[in-house]
């Protein structure tokens, strides 16, 4: 079943509007939506209850209500989830977390970034990378750092739609492609 992107965007914008500028509420909601989305993707029973036309609306709302209570989702946000279930568009739950995070980042002019290196990186170098990219992109970047030994050396830096791959692995792949052209 295809996700209705217009409906998804409407729900996300409504959530952000009712939550306002409260960064803590937005962050907690984002985390709860991550868990809800993961539950939807991984638990076929939950997904079947939400999507099944044979399950009554009352049963769907009861099941969703129990889950939302466990996730400590703000009261203001719950009606939007129930609206999706009522309109038979419960499948938006699988993409709700990404769309919500994207709109929150846009709202606060922040971007999630990732630095992947072959070896540990010190804070000083990370801050230099962050400063350069923030000036280039014009937004605040929140980095997560990962290690991947398969890179051999160098780094892969991702921030929003910006990707910079300076890894030795990538260099070797490019070299291989250029040598096999002849």
From Swiss-Prot:
Pfam families attached to this UniProt entry: OSCP
Membrane disposition: Peripheral membrane protein
Compartments it resides in: Cell inner membrane
Cross-referenced InterPro entries: ATP_synth_OSCP/delta_N_sf, ATPase_OSCP/dsu
Segment forming the signal sequence: none
NCBIfam families reported for this sequence: ATP_synt_delta
Protein's name in the database: ATP synthase subunit delta
Organism: Sulfurihydrogenibium azorense (strain DSM 15241 / OCM 825 / Az-Fu1)
């Amino acid at each position: 079943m295809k996700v209705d992107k217009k409906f998804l965007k409407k729900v996300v914008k409504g959530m952000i509007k009712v939550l306002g500028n409260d960064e803590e509420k937005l962050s907690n909601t984002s985390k709860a939506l991550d868990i809800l989305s993961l539950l939807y993707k991984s638990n076929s029973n939950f997904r079947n209850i939400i999507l099944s036309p044979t399950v009554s609306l009352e049963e769907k709302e009861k099941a969703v209500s129990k889950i939302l209570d466990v996730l400590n989702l703000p009261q203001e946000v719950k009606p939007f989830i129930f609206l999706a279930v009522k309109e038979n568009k419960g499948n938006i739950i699988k993409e709700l977390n990404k769309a919500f995070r994207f709109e929150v980042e846009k709202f606060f002019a922040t971007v999630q970034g990732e630095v992947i290196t072959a070896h540990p990186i010190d804070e000083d170098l990370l801050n230099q990378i962050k400063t350069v990219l923030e000036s280039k992109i014009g937004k605040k970047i929140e980095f997560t750092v990962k290690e991947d030994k398969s890179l051999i050396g160098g780094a892969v830096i991702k921030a929003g739609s910006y990707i910079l791959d300076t890894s030795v692995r990538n260099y070797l792949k490019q070299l291989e492609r250029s040598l096999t052209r002849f």
